Amino acid sequence: PIAETDDAGTVHDRLMAIGAALVVETVDRIIDHDGHVETTEQESLTTDTAPLRDAPKIFRDTCHIDWCQPTERVYNFIRGLAPYPAAWTEILSADGRRMALKVFRSERIAEPHALSPGAIRTDGRRHLDVATEDGFLRLLDVQPAGKRRMTADQFLNGTDVSACCMA
């Protein structure tokens, strides 16, 4: 099962290990049965009657975070794109400057508010919370454009976001 804190990277790594073990098991069965292995039609493994579709190509704009969505949806959007290609947003300063920010990890805060989606709530040192439609997301791991990945408190040590919002 996929845990609440898993992201695409952790699921990928787990499936990679399962796949490697399955390859070894399959080769062992082929050897044990003189090259004969019972096959299974792939169609028999699905129970849904809807046709399968190809996954859409992911572009940079596809990865942009829409803070007007419910907290759960934004949280899952970030998890689904982490660690690569990574969800991103822009920090809009009071003077109109924009800074791209990739978001790798966050946590949900179920707290009603009257703030606009994308509004930033911070203590300036450790917590970087962004308002969503129905709560907040606390950003935990981020990467400013042109810099390395860092924790939110490391980011806040060098960046004043008190008069900023997310775009």
Report the location of each language-model feature.
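An anion-binding loop in the catalytic cleft
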Residues: T62-A167
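Active-site-proximal loop/hinge segments within enzyme catalytic domains
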Residues: P1-I109
